[in-house]
């Protein structure tokens, strides 16, 4: 996958290209990330990238010319058909379904806003989709862009050592993930559930599914409203609720 990024602070993306799973993906050639700074497309000695909004009001907007030139240059550098995304509080909220949709694209161009945002005409003429990571405001689109890159890259074949990790994570099937345990067997008098050491794969699968359903019911019950549970899932959830209420 190729990802282009338009940002006034391209150095921030070293945390994506140099570290962790995404850094390994870059080294393996599975993920390519290129950045363009609108400041490099300015024509004045101050390298100005902000401008006053028409109608007055507080704050500034990103200057049209440097931003637009950066976008056009990035589009030309893309290896193929590219989906252009503007990270914005007004965009569609990113969730697991959205991540999986975005992961089907071979090329993405992410525009990171700053100040009070960008000229609406840039969005209308250059942007395919707007995406948000939540109902809150940040100082810029860089961290949302890094969040999007990190989550989408997990679905690139070969990025994760075991692709099942992406398929079994929280939200992958509409549910929160089940609890996980590693050594030691006893930690501060708390023992690993015996079923996980039983070697019975059927029992382990059912335990994990039951815990996943129960954790979703406890912490994010609204997620269950949108799911059509199987008979097995209905039974396991009922058992979890009964056991929980009996405590």
From Swiss-Prot:
It catalyses: guanosine(37) in tRNA + S-adenosyl-L-methionine = N(1)-methylguanosine(37) in tRNA + S-adenosyl-L-homocysteine + H(+). The keyword Methyltransferase applies. Its EC number is 2.1.1.228. It is an enzyme of class 2 (transferase). S-adenosyl-L-methionine binds at residues 113, 133-138. The keyword tRNA processing applies. GO terms for cellular component: cytosol. One of its GO terms (molecular function) is tRNA (guanine(37)-N1)-methyltransferase activity. Keywords: Cytoplasm, Methyltransferase, S-adenosyl-L-methionine, Transferase, tRNA processing. It is found in: Cytoplasm. It comes from the Bacteria. InterPro entries: Alpha/beta_knot_MTases (IPR029028), tRNA_m1G_MeTrfase_C_sf (IPR023148), tRNA_m1G_MeTrfase_TrmD (IPR002649), tRNA_m1G_MTases_N (IPR029026), tRNA_MeTrfase_TRMD/TRM10 (IPR016009). One of its GO terms (biological process) is tRNA N1-guanine methylation. Specifically methylates guanosine-37 in various tRNAs. Homodimer. NCBIfam families: PRK00026.1, trmD. HAMAP family: TrmD. Belongs to the RNA methyltransferase TrmD family. This is tRNA (guanine-N(1)-)-methyltransferase. It comes from Vibrio parahaemolyticus serotype O3:K6 (strain RIMD 2210633). The gene is trmD.
